[in-house]
């Protein structure tokens, strides 16, 4: 299966609110028809207030996230200050575009979640064609098709962290109900003025305990 085909069978979800941005990703890692592990962390901490969620083959996603993280750290060491979220997204998009033009594209789709003191929560959606857009909410993969209507219905920029987490739980529950793919576990992280925080994993047991 091609790398972009693999990314479509994975899922990324994101919500941007006034004081934070929350993203979730499935934790399934497969090779052909074999499940390698179901606790993969696809949400990578790039800096103190920046998370990057990536879909694609394990090699591409890990290598690209580390490439971005190390270059951002190098920039901070050289210049004495770090890049803001918009600048990191611009750097990421340029590298995706350069790879695409070179004939050896980086086959990853991603969500970039960040927090800036002036802008508040920020969410960007990027794909392997280097298309980039700032969005209030986003979803990648076939599973995301079941979630866009839920996000559109319940999204508000004034949501609190518990409320946004509940919206993501609704999305995951619909994925479990409607999608034939096995995506049982979703990791969730939130970035705010306090930094990056990991929230409880959303899985089938979450909904059993909620009853």
Question: Where in this protein do the model-derived segments appear?
Answer:
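Long, low-complexity N-terminal extensions
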Residues: 1-211
